[in-house]
Every structure is written in structure tokens, then in C-alpha cells.
């Protein structure tokens, strides 16, 4: 079959198509289907949401989940599944969704969504993986490989810098290239290089004043030329601003169709010569290639939704994060009388609203999933769908709390608090929930909170409750996963894929999120833990954090090469031991810290992780690899990644704030950074460039001699007044032109030195 694809002559097929057929191939037939050309054997194919389960609509189509879709399995949304830090698990989830797509005649699944969690307020954060681009990219690549192993395509989205819902169809994300390359692009880049998704979905927004749908730099220069993407680019639904400009920029497919309006504009542009027909042909070829890649591999397999439901439960169990377990209040014992309080115990919130909303065939709640011999009483406590303090419900909950040994409060955000289409205005739980939690704590200190939310919430009761389980949105089997973790049937192993700040104002984007036609990303590369850890700020819970019912120790950190060059790959290994009494899984995290940074960089950055399962007393060696990119930052002068020579610390930890082992390496890089030397170039800049460092030393020496009246020694009083540190600081920021005033140089001499230095830079001595 693969050979048949390779022998298919797409260019010949395209040559037989009319201009109208080619233009039509570049837009959808309707909300979900691509057009067919029956006379040439081009089939009609369907695409469908979504990132955590199929939202296939047979009748009325829409992109916001307003109309019904077929019954399907809702897997845990990305906000939860990313907390698994488990590539194999995510690949398995992808395979399962891919099988369901094959069986339902869906050619492309519209996901995963890998936009970075810039702010907790983004209404669509439940659908996104992480604040960290490395984690998001690794998880996304695994998911994509899983789906596409079933010969069903994916459409990674939303490319790019789509990090809020407010005015998402028109606002401009204003970010410098380094920020885009280091934070908002890498998850997409990793997906291309490790999984080659069949399709990309461009975002609604503008990037620095140009719509993503017509941004040639984004869709062609970066995506295709830099990264090597081979598939087709489709628009988000209704994202096209100028169809002809979009086609020229690299937008192949408009979704949904525009009732022929934009097809006519394409044909007119070809006829009047403003659009080259080869550009149209190239787009058609990309689309046909993916259509046939699916059509030639039609292999529907039987699947049972019940089995996939159990897979959804397993993913949720592997991902939920135990945040607090004071006095080992968890796991619960069947012999204990436990009060479950809160509507989410009976009717869980397990997915978000909008295009990814699944019509579940089955939903499991925690109340019905507890062990058969468990002693559980239930009180609703507060309505789960609105912020309303009900005195009668509260009184019932308080009475249950008084007679119980322990209380588990199922708190969280109602559907109306977060959804696609709008952002939150605050990080608070509904007031009615916080009020009831406070009252219950007055009568029952043995209280555990289970959170159902798509994005972090403030926790005013954090120091008073004994346990917190972050369940996020758990998918349709999330209730069973919660019950199994609470009762110790499953040992929690998830870790936070995002930082939980103490309060909203602590977030780095706080002053620059939301309103206006332009959103300025002034925090630059300091997103999430990159900001909090660099600032050494107090957080509620740090990135990568999560507890287990067992304990782990780390030892024997080994690094294969402590003096690498930028061309080397380094192997890092560490032993992890389960020092507790039950089996468990630990997520080992590797961070890199630039100790001699020549530019402003975060305190540390995640560059590796592995999840390892260990029996009690068992030790395993975890191995990870680092390459040039692991140490590099994006240099806009080089237009490339640059790993500067110097010392780097390899940090092994259980979270970004819990570093267990570290070792320093020294990297050497022969890569030359372009440098234009002029009158305002500083001595510090010359010192920091290996090609001009020696010349800078000579200039500084002459400058200091002139300052000392031609002598290398200063008077005692001067020596006391001017320290070496002062001189170093002054010379570091001194422009070359200042040598006229302070160094006894003429303007002509300085220009001659500049010419000499530029020559040294251009032809460095080997």
C-alpha cells in the first residue's frame, strides 16, 4: 500500500484539474469535510475535533460544541494528561483516539493544542499542556505519533502565540523573536521534528501585526524552511483574513468553506496574474498528499468504548497530582466514616466547553466508584453549577462533617467560569465554596480538598486543610480515578505541568494580559517557573511538584562528558530508589542552569524528564541525553540557537524547587557571533567575545595606565577610593568613543582600532 502511495502521480492529477477544482480543493466543503473530485478519484474526507476525544458531528456542524456529536470517549484534557510526564502513556492515548477515528471515518483529528500557558486566566488552558515548551513538545510528539500510527492525521494547533481568548480573532500578540523561538514555538517545532504531524492549524490572532493565516515568515520561513514541515496548513475555523495573501504565505486549506467566495478570489487572482498558479498547485498537492495518505490506509478496526473508558481512567490515575498529605491523611481506609461534600462528587466537571466538548457515552463519578466496603455519606453542600451559598445545603454538609472521621470536599470551577471563547477575570473559586470550606474546617480539621478545574485557583485554605488532590478535568472516567487515589488503590504519580501561584498578581503577565487590540508579551522568556524561580518568589506549588504515598531518593549522578563542545551529545544518568513500603512511580526532572550567561536567561530550564516505576526498595538508573539545544538560547544576530562557552549546572530534581543532585560542566563553543564594532561598542562587549577579548585587555590596560598618569600604580588615597570592582564595572560599560576623554586616544586612533578589531573579529587567529 505504501508503494502505491509513492507511485501516485499527484502532479499529473493536478494537471487534470480545472482552475475551479483546484481553488475549491483549498477550502472546506462544509464545516468538517474536504471536497472531492469524483472524476479524478479524489475522495471526500472528514476532519473532526478533538484533542482528547472525538467530537464528530453528523448533522449540524459548528466549532463551539453547541450542536450534538456522536457518542464517544472523553479522555482527560491536556491540563491533566500533561501532568503524567509520560510519553508512552500519551502515545497510547493517541493510538486509542486514532483507532476510534479510523472506525468513524475521520481522516484528521484536530489536535493536540500546544499553546503555552502564559496566564492562569486563559479560558482555554484546560486544553493546553503546560507553561513549559519542552514538556509540551515532548507530550505532543508522543500523542501525535500515537494517533498517526493508526494512519489518521493530526492537526497541531494553534500556531502561534494564541494565549488568550479575549479578542482572539483579531488581537495582535506582540513578542520579540527570541521570546517566540524560546517559549511559544518549541512545542510546535518538537512535534514536527519528532512526529511530523499531517497538518498544522494556524491561529486566529495576529503576530506582531500580521495575521497568522497570512504570515509568510511563520507558515513558510519558520514552519517549512527552518523545521521541515511536510504536510498542509489549515486555518482555524473562520481565521482567514485575506485568502490570496494566505495562500501565498503558506495557508493551504481554509476551514470551513466560505460558500465559494474565497475560491472565486483565488481564481480571479490566478487569472489576472497576481497569484502564480504554481502556488495554488503546491497547496493542492500538499492537501492531496494527506488525503491519500489516509484514504490509501483505510483500516477500520473494531473497538469497544468500554475498553477505551478504562484507558481514560488509567490516564487520569497516572496524571492527578497529590499536592498535600499532612499527617498522612490519605489514603482513606474503608473502616473510616468519610463525608463526601460537593456536587462534583456526584456530577463531576470533567471537560471544558467549546470545540473539544465530547458527547460521552458514559460518566463515572467518585461517589459510585468508591470501594464496596467504604463508609461514605454524601452532602451536596453547594451547587456545582453556580456561585450561590445555600444555607440548607451548607447545614447538611456541616452535619455530615461533624459525624464523619474525615471529610473530602469536591470543589472546583463551574463550566461558566472557564471555557473556549472567553477568559477568566480572577483565580478564585466560587465564594460559596470557599465559605463552606472555612465552616467545615471549624468543625472537622481532617479535611481533604479535591479540585476540579482547568487552570490553577487561589487556595485561601491551603494551610488549614490536611490534603489536596489536584484532579483538574479528569475526562469521563475521572471520578473513578479520584476514588482509586483517595482509597490507595492507585498511588498518585502526577506532577504539576504548571506553577500554581499564590495569587493572580504574582503572574508575570499580570499587567499585560487581556484587553486591547495589541497584547504585549513584556515578560519575554520569563514565563511560568522561569519567572517565579528566577525571582525566587513564593508560590503555592512549584512546577514539576507532586507527592506520592511512597518516598524516593536520588543518588549517583553521572555525566558522560563534563567538558563537551557544542557538537557533543551528553548522557546524564541518576539512580532512583523507592525508599517506601509500597510500589510507586517517580518523575525525574533534569534542568540546566547557565552559570556564566552572556545574556539574560532564566534561573533554570527543563531539558529532560523520565517517569520510572519502582517496587519498594528497588533502584533503577534513569538516563537522559543533552545536546547543544539543551544549553542554547536563541540569538537574533545569528538567527540560530547559540550555546555560549562557559559553565553550566546540571540539576536533577523532583520539581523545579526540589533539586536533589547537581554537577557542573564546562562547554566550549567555536561558533562565531556576528559583531559590528563601532564607536559605541563597549569594552565589556569586546571582553565577552572570544575573538576580541585579548584586544580588549590591551585597550583596558592602556586606559588604566592613562588614568594613573602614565603609571601602573596609583596613589594610596586613589587606591582606597577606587576599587578593582569599581574599575571593572566602569570599563565594562564604557564605549570606545570615551577613550578620547579618558584614555589619551585621538578619534583617529580609535577608528583605526575599530578597523583593526573588526578585522580581528572577521579573521580570528586560530
Task: Indicate residue ranges for each PLM-predicted region.
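Terminal connector regions
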Residues: 627-671
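Low-complexity, Pro/Ser/Thr- and charge-rich linker/hinge segments at domain boundaries
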Residues: 668-688
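Generic surface-pattern signal
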Residues: 15, 19, 31, 271, ...
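Conserved, compact domain cores that house catalytic/ligand-binding motifs in diverse enzymes
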Residues: 681-752
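In a subset of proteins, long, contiguous C-terminal domains/tails are tracked
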Residues: 528, 544, 548, 581-583, ...
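Generic structural signal of hydrophobic/aromatic residues within well-ordered alpha-helices
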Residues: 10-13, 266, 496, 726, ...
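Glycoside hydrolase catalytic-domain context in secreted enzymes
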Residues: 1-632, 647-652, 656
Amino acid at each position: 500500500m505504501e508503494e502505491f502511495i509513492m507511485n501516485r502521480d499527484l502532479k499529473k492529477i493536478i494537471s487534470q484539474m480545472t482552475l475551479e477544482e483546484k481553488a475549491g480543493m483549498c477550502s472546506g466543503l462544509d464545516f468538517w469535510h474536504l471536497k472531492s473530485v469524483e472524476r479524478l478519484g479524489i475522495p471526500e474526507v472528514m476532519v473532526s475535533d478533538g484533542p482528547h476525544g472525538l467530537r464528530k458531528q453528523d448533522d449540524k456542524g459548528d466549532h463551539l460544541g453547541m450542536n450534538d456529536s456522536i457518542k464517544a470517549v472523553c479522555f482527560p484534557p491536556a491540563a491533566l494528561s500533561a501532568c503524567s510526564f509520560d510519553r508512552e502513556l500519551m502515545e497510547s492515548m493517541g493510538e486509542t483516539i486514532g483507532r476510534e477515528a479510523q472506525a468513524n471515518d475521520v481522516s484528521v483529528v484536530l489536535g493536540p493544542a500546544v499553546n503555552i500557558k502564559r496566564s492562569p486566566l486563559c479560558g482555554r488552558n484546560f486544553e493546553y499542556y503546560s507553561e513549559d515548551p519542552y514538556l509540551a513538545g515532548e507530550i505532543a510528539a508522543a500523542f501525535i505519533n500515537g494517533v498517526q500510527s493508526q494512519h489518521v492525521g493530526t492537526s497541531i494547533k494553534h500556531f502561534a502565540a494564541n494565549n488568550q481568548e479575549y479578542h482572539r480573532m483579531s488581537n495582535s500578540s506582540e513578542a520579540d523573536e527570541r521570546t517566540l523561538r524560546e517559549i511559544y514555538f518549541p512545542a510546535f517545532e518538537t512535534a514536527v521534528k519528532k512526529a511530523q504531524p499531517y497538518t498544522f492549524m494556524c491561529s486566529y490572532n495576529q503576530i506582531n501585526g500580521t495575521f497568522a493565516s497570512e504570515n509568510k515568515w511563520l507558515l513558510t520561513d519558520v514552519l517549512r524552511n527552518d523545521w521541515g514541515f511536510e504536510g498542509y496548513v489549515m486555518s482555524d475555523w473562520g481565521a482567514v483574513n485575506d485568502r490570496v495573501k494566505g495562500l501565498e504565505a503558506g495557508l493551504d486549506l481554509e476551514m470551513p468553506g466560505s460558500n465559494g467566495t474565497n475560491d472565486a478570489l483565488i481564481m480571479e487572482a490566478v487569472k489576472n496574474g497576481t497569484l502564480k498558479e504554481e502556488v495554488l498547485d503546491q497547496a493542492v498537492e500538499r492537501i492531496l498528499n494527506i488525503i491519500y495518505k489516509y484514504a490509501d490506509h483505510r483500516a477500520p478496526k473494531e473497538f469497544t468504548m468500554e475498553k477505551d473508558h478504562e484507558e481514560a481512567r488509567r490516564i487520569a490515575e497516572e496524571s492527578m497530582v497529590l499536592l498535600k498529605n499532612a499527617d498522612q491523611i490519605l489514603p482513606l481506609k474503608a473502616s473510616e466514616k468519610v463525608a463526601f461534600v460537593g456536587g462534583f462528587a456526584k456530577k463531576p466537571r470533567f471537560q471544558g466547553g467549546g470545540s473539544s466538548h465530547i458527547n460521552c457515552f458514559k460518566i463515572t463519578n467518585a461517589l459510585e466508584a468508591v470501594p464496596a466496603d467504604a463508609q461514605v455519606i454524601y452532602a451536596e453542600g453547594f451547587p456545582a453549577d453556580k456561585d450561590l451559598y445555600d444555607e440548607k445545603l451548607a447545614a447538611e454538609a456541616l452535619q455530615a462533617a461533624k459525624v464523619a472521621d474525615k471529610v473530602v470536599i469536591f470543589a472546583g470551577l463551574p463550566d461558566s467560569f472557564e471555557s473556549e471563547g472567553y477568559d477568566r477575570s480572577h483565580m478564585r473559586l466560587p465564594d460559596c465554596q470557599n465559605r463552606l470550606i472555612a465552616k467545615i474546617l471549624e468543625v472537622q480539621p481532617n479535611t481533604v480538598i479535591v479540585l476540579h478545574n482547568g487552570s490553577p485557583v487561589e487556595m485561601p485554605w491551603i494551610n488549614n486543610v490536611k490534603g489536596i488532590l489536584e484532579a483538574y478535568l479528569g475526562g469521563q472516567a475521572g471520578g473513578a480515578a479520584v476514588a482509586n487515589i483517595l482509597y490507595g488503590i492507585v498511588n498518585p504519580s502526577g506532577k504539576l505541568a504548571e506553577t500554581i501561584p499564590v495569587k493572580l498578581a504574582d503572574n508575570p503577565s499580570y499587567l499585560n494580559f487581556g484587553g486591547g487590540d495589541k497584547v504585549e508579551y513584556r515578560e519575554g522568556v520569563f514565563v511560568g517557573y522561569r519567572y517565579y524561580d528566577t525571582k525566587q518568589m513564593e508560590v503555592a506549588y512549584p512546577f514539576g511538584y507532586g507527592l506520592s504515598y511512597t518516598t524516593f531518593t536520588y543518588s549517583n549522578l553521572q555525566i558522560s562528558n563534563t567538558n563537551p563542545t557544542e557538537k557533543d551529545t551528553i548522557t546524564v544518568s541518576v539512580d532512583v530508589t523507592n525508599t517506601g513500603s509500597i510500589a510507586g512511580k517517580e518523575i525525574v526532572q533534569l534542568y540546566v542552569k547557565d552559570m556564566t550567561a552572556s545574556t539574560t536567561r532564566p534561573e533554570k530550564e527543563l531539558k529532560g524528564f523520565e517517569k520510572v516505576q519502582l517496587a519498594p526498595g528497588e533502584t533503577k538508573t534513569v538516563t537522559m541525553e543533552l545536546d547543544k539545544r539543551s544549553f542554547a538560547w536563541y540569538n537574533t544576530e545569528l538567527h540560530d540557537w547559540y550555546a555560549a562557552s562557559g559553565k553550566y549546572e546540571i540539576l536533577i530534581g523532583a520539581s523545579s524547587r526540589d533539586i536533589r543532585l547537581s554537577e557542573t560542566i564546562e562547554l566550549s563553543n567555536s561558533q562565531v557571533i556576528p559583531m559590528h564594532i563601532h564607536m559605541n561598542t563597549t569594552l565589556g562587549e569586546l571582553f565577552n567575545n572570544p575573538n576580541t577579548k585579548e584586544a580588549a585587555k590591551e585597550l583596558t590596560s592602556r586606559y588604566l595606565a592613562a588614568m594613573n598618569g602614565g603609571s601602573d600604580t596609583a596613589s594610596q588615597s586613589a587606591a582606597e577610593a577606587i576599587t578593582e570592582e569599581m574599575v571593572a564595572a566602569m570599563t565594562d560599560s564604557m564605549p570606545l568613543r570615551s577613550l578620547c576623554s579618558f584614555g589619551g586616544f585621538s578619534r583617529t586612533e580609535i577608528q583605526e582600532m575599530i578597523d583593526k578589531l573588526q578585522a580581528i573579529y572577521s579573521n580570528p587567529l586560530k
